[in-house]
Each structure stands twice: as structure tokens, then as C-alpha cells.
Regions:
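A solvent-exposed interaction/effector surface
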Residues: 4-180
């Protein structure tokens, strides 16, 4: 027979587990709602038509990805997802960042970083802020690793307006279930 203290301690542990599970499920639900919203938006949006969009400052959890090895990249992406869930209490779509200079040289399939948008600023060396401003956005159907078509469309759009493109990055927030 256990002591009342031991029983109470065990119950505290159970309550903590339940609270943790509730938090995890709420995050999952928030992610699902966000994904639904993104897919609905993408379904309504005209494809392959660049447009200017005003965006607020965003906080991104960013991880570097090794170029070269697909297996290593997959492991690093899995680690990024684990980290975002464990330390940043968020479950979100993972976007990828490409270097503008790679694309200028015709390399459309090498992404150098992955990121997840966070709900709030967090103290971590991996969290970067993307400033508020006007961005060119484009919905395109295709594969994450082939950015040639979106890049050409966005470059032409920026060129027509005499706009300088962001010095380093083009990012792709891919909805896998959207691609065909």
C-alpha cells in the first residue's frame, strides 16, 4: 500500500502529462486550421500570377541544410521539425530558402535552409525575424525542388516594376498535398 503522499505525487505527474497532451493537441489543431486556410487560399488564388503582398514582421525558426546529400538533408529537416515541436511549441508547414545567386546561375533545386513560422518571438539563436514590408508572392503548382518557373515569373514581375529582388533568398512554402 502506497502512502497518500506518493499517490498525490503520482496524480501530479498524471495531470502534467494530460496538460502536455492537451497543449500538443491544441497545437496540432491550430496547425490543421492554418493548413486548411492556406489550401483554401491557394485554391482560390490565380496560379502563376505574381502579386505584391504587404506582410507584417514574422519570426522564423531557421535551420541550415547540407547541400549534396539528400539523406543528410532529410535527417536535418526531421531534426528541424522535432525542434520546432519540442522547443517552440509550434507545428507548422516547413518552408525552404534558396539563394538568389544560385537561381541566377540556373541552379533551381538547391535549398540552403528550412524554416517554420512561429506565433511569437522566442529567444533562440535559430530564430530570425523577417521584416515587415511588401513582398512578391506567387502560387504555383509544382515540386519544392524545381523553382525555375516561379523564379522566372517573379524575376520578370520584379523587372517590369524596376524592383530590386531580395538579395539572397527566395522561399517556398510548400503544401505537399497541393502539388501534383
Amino acid at each position: 500500500s502506497g502512502s497518500p503522499e506518493r499517490f498525490m505525487s503520482m496524480m501530479d505527474g498524471k495531470k502534467r502529462q494530460i496538460d502536455e497532451e492537451i497543449r500538443r493537441l491544441k497545437n496540432m489543431k491550430r496547425f490543421i486550421l492554418h493548413e486548411e486556410e492556406s489550401v483554401q487560399l491557394a485554391m482560390k488564388a490565380a496560379l502563376d500570377e505574381p502579386r505584391l503582398v504587404e506582410r507584417d514582421r514574422e519570426y522564423l525558426l531557421v535551420s541550415d541544410i547540407s547541400a549534396g546529400s539528400e539523406r543528410k538533408a532529410a535527417v536535418e529537416i526531421a531534426e528541424h521539425v522535432r525542434m520546432q515541436e519540442k522547443y517552440h511549441d509550434t507545428v507548422g508547414a516547413v518552408g525552404s530558402i534558396y539563394l538568389g545567386e544560385d537561381m541566377d546561375r540556373g541552379i533551381y533545386d538547391r535549398y540552403v535552409k528550412v524554416y517554420t513560422r512561429l506565433d511569437k518571438k522566442t529567444a533562440s539563436r535559430r530564430v530570425q525575424s523577417r521584416p515587415e514590408g511588401v513582398y512578391v508572392e506567387l502560387y504555383s503548382r509544382g515540386h519544392l525542388w524545381d523553382m525555375e518557373k516561379p523564379y522566372r515569373l517573379i524575376s520578370a514581375f520584379a523587372g517590369e516594376r524596376g524592383t530590386r529582388q531580395g538579395q539572397t533568398s527566395h522561399d517556398a512554402l510548400t503544401l505537399d498535398h497541393q502539388t501534383e
